[in-house]
Amino acid sequence: MLEQMGQAAKAASYQLSVLSTAEKNQLLMTIADRLEAQSAEILAANQQDLADARQNGMSAALLDRLMLDRQRLKGIADDVRQVCRLADPVGVVIDGGKLDSGLRIERRRVPLGVVGVIYEARPNVTVDVASLCLKTGNAVILRGGKETYRTNAATVRVIQDALKRHGVPAAAVQAIESPDRELVNQLLKLDRYVDMLIPRGGAGLHKLCREQSTIPVITGGIGVCHIYVDRSIEQEAALKVIVNAKKQRPSACNSVETLLIDAAIADSFLPALSARMAQEGISLHADARSLPLLQQGPACVSAVTDAQYRDEWLALDLNVKLVDDLSEGIAHIREYGTQHSDAILTRTIKHADRFVNEVDSSAVYVNASTRFTDGGQFGLGAEVAVSTQKLHARGPMGLEALTTYKWVAFGDDTVRD
């Protein structure tokens, strides 16, 4: 089954690679229109997936990731239209020049070929990834989680209908519809056809892909994100950022999980933090130094464990730790962070500069919420993933991250001496 999917995807990638920007944009506009026109089919499938997920005891955070409604589906379609408006990187000449040999040489952006994406209960990923891959002339094989297989299958059928309307093979976007986990292992070995693999899920999935895949893997998306609260902050401004970073969408991988607070402001900041978190419905998990102070406030608070520092809450829960200085804060991030998104709230330029230079994350913020680590927010359009590694891409992966390059040389019957 997967061998045939791989063959078909590779063949489709050759046809996609020579489409003009205008042709790709017309195709994407049709996909966006069909997603809205056929929304009833997708939403009905999603309701079935949601019913099964609730019956199986899925957490509220994961249910939120899984759920689609007309508003979210319209937002997904609008994201596809936004991809149409983005500059096409394919064919762009990165650099080049005339050589002493007489050759005129250039380095030109080209599609990767076939991209494989493994993801969990995120039906929006199906469309986001497909639109970015099509814009860059790549075919894609999608393997969503068993929780979303009906939603994904319905969505891909709509996309394939749009492909056929434009004379593009349906195999340009394929979904592995079976929830059988053995098919994941088979996909990991499909290096004859698949050029890059992107897992979007938990640590277990990332570990499996790194250890078992014969395809180059881009890992990321696990977000144990921190905010360091410096002694020089303005209290109300800091609380506003913290609430946004935690509450706007707690199930997102760029939501904050741990606050590191300069102990010098504990007596004034922790009572205010407790009051605001109680107001927002956010539970706190405190270290031994902050726990007694926080227990005097109205927020729900319990003792934090070492394991909780290492995991994503993806819910209205927030770790709190007092640190003696910025050095201790940076050391904690190095020990427990996932190199996703980390922020400092400060009015001290020296501290901001040091944090930016010493925290080795894919996105580092000064006086801003971690929630901005997103392809759309960064002006990249929909993202295929957020990479926390350093090769071949880092941070939100937009269009350029789905390309590679080739060297093209032009001669005049030129030979090497």
Curated annotation (Swiss-Prot):
Function: Catalyzes the NADPH-dependent reduction of L-glutamate 5-phosphate into L-glutamate 5-semialdehyde and phosphate. The product spontaneously undergoes cyclization to form 1-pyrroline-5-carboxylate.
InterPro entries, per database record: Ald_DH/histidinol_DH, Ald_DH_C, Ald_DH_N, Aldehyde_DH_dom, Glu-5-SA_DH, GPR_dom
Principal subcellular localisation of the protein: cytoplasm
Coiled-coil residues: none
Single Gene Ontology MF annotation: NADP binding
Catalytic reaction equation(s): L-glutamate 5-semialdehyde + phosphate + NADP(+) = L-glutamyl 5-phosphate + NADPH + H(+)
Pfam family, one: Aldedh
Lineage: Bacteria, Pseudomonadati, Pseudomonadota, Gammaproteobacteria, Enterobacterales
Keywords assigned: Amino-acid biosynthesis, Cytoplasm, NADP, Oxidoreductase, Proline biosynthesis
Entry keyword annotation includes Oxidoreductase: yes
Gene source species: Erwinia tasmaniensis (strain DSM 17950 / CFBP 7177 / CIP 109463 / NCPPB 4357 / Et1/99)
Localization in the cell: Cytoplasm
Pathway entry: Amino-acid biosynthesis; L-proline biosynthesis; L-glutamate 5-semialdehyde from L-glutamate: step 2/2
Record-stated family: Belongs to the gamma-glutamyl phosphate reductase family.
EC code: 1.2.1.41
CDD domains for the chain: ALDH_F18-19_ProA-GPR (cd07079)
GO CC, any one term: cytoplasm
GO biological process, one term: L-proline biosynthetic process
Oxidoreductase keyword on record: yes
Protein name, entry field: Gamma-glutamyl phosphate reductase
